[in-house]
Structures are given as C-alpha cells and as structure tokens.
C-alpha cells in the first residue's frame, strides 16, 4: 500500500482531495479483495487534523477489516505511542511470544540522513517494545541517489542498515524489516518515474535476504494519469518483477499517477493483475496425481475428451485463474452487452464489494479507541476534529 493525498477520476485523471469518507470506502473495498492480505492506510484524508491523521486512519481500518493492519506513516512520538496503544487494544497482542500488534514505518531522508523528529519517534517506540519497525528510505536515482542503479541500491541499503543499527543499539532485539522505495527519474523532466521496470527491487530484496531481513518492496506502479493500456502494462510488468524476487510484502496496490492519487477502480484492476501474476510465479504441480497416466489414457480414448474426467474438474480451477473483471467471453456477446471496458467493470465490481456493512469492532474496544484519539488530541492541543465515534457508527 501507499499513502496518497488525492482521489482521481479513472477516465479523466481529474483530482480532488481525499476525505475520511473516502478512507472508509477504500478500506471496505480492500478488505474484500482476494489478494489484499494486509491492509494499510491508502489515503491521507484532508478533513482530519494532520497530527491526528494516523490515528483516525487506523481506526477506519480497524472498523472495516479483520485482516492484519499495518501501521500508517508516523512522524512523531505521540503518534507512534497512540498507534501502538490502539493496535494492542484491537489485536490483544503485546509482542510476547513473537506476536506483535502492529508494524510502524520510519523513513530516513535521502541521502543518508536520519531526521530528528522521526528518529526520536522510532527510538521511543523501540524502547517501549512490542512493535515491529520498518526502515523505509525513499531515494530517487539521479537526484537524491546516484543515477546508476547499483550505486543507488547501495546507498538505499546503507540507509536501511543505519536504521537497523540504531534500533538494535537503543533496543536490542527489536524486530525490523527492509522497506526499499528507490525510484527512477525521467531525464527529460526531472520528475519521478514510477512506470519504468523497477529492477532495483530485485536487488533490494536480495540484499535484504543476505542480511536476514524480510523485505517490503514495491510492485504495482505506473506513471499513467488514467486507467488505460499504459496503466495495465506498466503495473503488470512491475508486479511481476517485484514478485519474482519473492519479497515478504508487495506494496503499491491502488496507486495511480506515480503514487499521487488513487481510486476504487484501480484497486479492483490491481487485484486482477495480482491474481494473474501470483499464479504465474507459483509452482505448478508435477507430481504423480498431476501426471496421472491412467487419466491421460482415459481422456485420449474417451469420445468426450478430457472434460468428462474427474481429473480435469479437479484441476481446471487451480490451473486457470478466473478474473474478477477481465473479459473472456465472445466478441458477439461483448458487442451485445454494449462494449463495456475494464474500467466500467471495475467500477461495478467496486460498488458490489463496498455495498456490505463494516466488519466493526466490539463496543468496548471501539470506545477505548475513541478515548485514545481524544486523549491524544487533548495532549496535542487539537480542539477542532471529527468525532471518531461517527466512524464506528457508519455515519462518515
């Protein structure tokens, strides 16, 4: 997942600022996608005070999903402390027995700077214990990192290891993982280019593995401003490159316009892309059952071919992934249905998936989460803020 400020129209690319209502809708959609194993905050709602935004975002995810929730972006010690408290309430985990309530990401400033405020928050949460930390550098080749991919990956590696070394110095044994976000640059404009084949992610995953660290790398990326053919081929190529290295986590789902915005349709299409890419990199069975010679003889001799065999019925679904929105019917049926494209199908699918009710949290947990937000707001002196109970009541 990413962390974007805007909602984009999938056909025109026009932007508007994301709201708390958008965060709720997108969380509900992500919960119901088949390839979304972990949920993290996708948008920064502008109608929430910035100092409290991670807390509201976590509350939204907790109310909308019972999947594992990754922590939102953290900038201050107050945010980090409150998120850990909220996650402990939701999960019941406290770090004992190797089970942790949440992971929190901390970003160095490239090149090779550990910012004071973020570093203080990272140290405080590590010394408190009971949390997993991700070191998340975001260098850009040719601007905040060298232009050569090898050199840029080496700098990024040093930035991650600096964070790891600091964590293990102040709180030995703190679980930590590797979050590379190295991006390319368009030499014609100087803008960040997200649609290029991101081969650096393979290098990053291998470097992380060499150090014994789990890796969260980017996969689905694109520079396209709308959901068009460019969006599809760039995201499919980069998802495949990302998964080829076998990272522990693959990020980027739902982002459009090089990570500047998102939309529900992008999430649905990305889910279809991931269905195909995950199938492509998964090993196919070559055991005795898959290569059953008796079944081959039966199919060859049968007047109905192989379709009538139990073997075919058993394997047809696992061997041939079924798309949620991709079209596989005949041309005549497609023409008769009005020539609907994948964006239309994705919009319809998103509507179906978000029509259900929120998963919700127990009432006592919900009350405690809201009190944590209110207490944090009081300590920070934030008087004007949305009522968090409206999120739990489905009134946002």
Which residues are covered by each model-predicted region?
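Short juxta-domain linker segments that transition from a proline/glycine-rich
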Residues: 1-2, 22, 31, 275-276
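Glycine-rich, N-terminal phosphate-binding loop and its surrounding beta-alpha-beta segment
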Residues: 1-10
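Helix-rich catalytic cores of soluble enzyme domains
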Residues: 14-248
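A diffuse structural propensity rather than consistent per-protein peaks
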Residues: 16-19, 115, 263, 287, ...
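Short acidic (Asp/Glu) and glycine-rich catalytic loops that position anionic groups and cofactors
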Residues: 101, 140, 182-185, 215-219, ...
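Hydrophobic alpha-helical bundle architecture
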Residues: 204-308
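Catalytic-core signal marking the mid-to-C-terminal active-site face
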Residues: 265-396
């Amino acid at each position: 997942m990413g962390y974007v400020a805007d909602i984009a129209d999938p056909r025109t690319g026009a932007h508007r600022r994301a709201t708390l209502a958008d965060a709720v809708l997108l969380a509900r959609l992500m919960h119901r996608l088949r390839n979304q194993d972990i949920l993290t905050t996708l948008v920064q709602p502008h109608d929430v005070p910035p100092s409290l935004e991670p807390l509201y975002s976590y509350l939204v995810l907790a109310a909308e999903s019972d999947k594992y929730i990754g922590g939102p972006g953290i900038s201050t010690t107050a945010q980090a402390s409150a998120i850990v408290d909220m996650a402990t309430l939701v999960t019941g985990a406290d770090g004992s027995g190797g089970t942790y309530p949440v992971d929190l990401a901390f970003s160095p400033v490239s090149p090779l700077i550990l910012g004071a405020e973020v570093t203080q928050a990272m140290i405080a949460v590590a010394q408190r214990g009971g949390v997993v930390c991700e070191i998340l550098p975001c260098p850009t080749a040719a601007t905040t990192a060298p232009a050569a991919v090898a050199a840029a990956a080496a700098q990024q590696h040093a930035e991650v290891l600096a964070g790891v070394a600091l964590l293990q110095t102040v709180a030995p044994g703190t679980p930590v993982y590797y979050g590379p976000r190295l991006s390319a640059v368009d030499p014609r404009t100087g803008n960040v280019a997200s649609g290029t084949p991101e081969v650096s992610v393979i290098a990053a995953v291998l470097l992380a593995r060499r150090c014994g660290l789990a890796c969260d790398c980017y996969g689905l990326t694109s520079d396209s401003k709308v959901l068009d053919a460019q969006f599809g081929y760039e995201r499919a190529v980069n998802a495949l490159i990302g998964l080829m290295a076998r990272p522990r986590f693959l990020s980027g789902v739902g982002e459009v316009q090089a990570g500047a915005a998102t939309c529900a349709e992008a999430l649905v299409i990305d889910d279809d892309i991931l269905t195909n890419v995950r199938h492509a990199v998964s090993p196919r069975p070559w055991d005795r059952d898959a290569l059953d010679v008796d079944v081959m003889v039966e199919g060859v001799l049968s007047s109905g071919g192989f379709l009538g065999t139990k073997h075919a019925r058993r394997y047809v679904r696992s061997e041939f992934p079924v798309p949620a929105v991709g079209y596989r019917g005949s041309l005549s049926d497609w023409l008769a249905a009005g020539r609907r494209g994948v964006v239309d199908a994705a919009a319809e699918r998103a509507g179906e998936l978000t029509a259900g009710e929120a998963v919700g949290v127990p009432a006592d947990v919900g009350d405690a989460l809201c009190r944590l937000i209110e207490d944090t707001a009081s300590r920070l002196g934030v008087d004007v803020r949305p009522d968090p109970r409206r999120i739990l009541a489905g009134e946002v």
